Amino acid sequence: MFSVSSVSKSYGKNKVLTDVSLSVSPGECIALLGINGSGKSTLLGILSRNIKPDSGCFGFDCQANAALLPQDNPLIPELTAIDNIRLWHPGSRKTVMNSHNMSICQSLCVDSFLDKRVSKLSGGMKKRLSLAITMMSDPDLLLLDEPLASLDLLCKNGILSYLQNYITHGGSVIIATHETSALDICNKIYTLKNGHIQLAIDRNISPGYTSPETYINLIRS
């Protein structure tokens, strides 16, 4: 299980997160809902241990691996897809594209454009490539910041199908999103407002929170 308890973070006088607590178990997916500036990205940064909170406690297995995929694709446009992979996972092409990593690329349909420059790829291709690179580190907890933003329906469905399979096999996922389609794979929903968790919903306990309109109202409330 991954958890944070009573976490707070400020930048100067700007309070970004205040007394935030949540936990995610193997095989669970949590959605973080909230308008821009509500603290979602900062919370993901803290969970990935890239941002140090001002206060609060962590509850992580010391051997557990958390990986963050930020909203902006961390790719070098002038390089090919395979060379971008090798930046994050050094080695020869043969070493990097072992059976494990090739399986990830095939599952995300990345194997068909490994030799193309990133500058020539569509937004959906870039997102799938970034996700593949992230998954090659074998994360126990996958942190996703707006993974479906600006993608077409086919690409969204492909990514969601991949994530559902990852969750089914015991992976944990936390998604910061505005996309109601992402909520189909989520067990729990947290809404953030002004750095506070405003509402926490367990869909197994509160099945009434199912319609897209409900989630849109939660984000705007």
Please annotate each region the language model reported.
Residues F2, L17-D19:
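Conserved structural motif at the start of ABC-family nucleotide-binding domains
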Residues L33-I35:
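The feature captures the beta-strand-to-loop junction immediately N-terminal to the Walker
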Residues S48:
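Helix-to-loop junction immediately C-terminal to a conserved catalytic motif
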Residues R86, N98-F113:
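Conserved ABC ATPase "signature" region
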Residues R117-G124:
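Conserved ABC ATPase signature
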Residues L142-E146:
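Catalytic Walker B motif of ABC-type/P-loop ATPase nucleotide-binding domains
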Residues L153-C155:
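Helix N-cap at the start of a conserved alpha-helix in ABC-type nucleotide-binding domains
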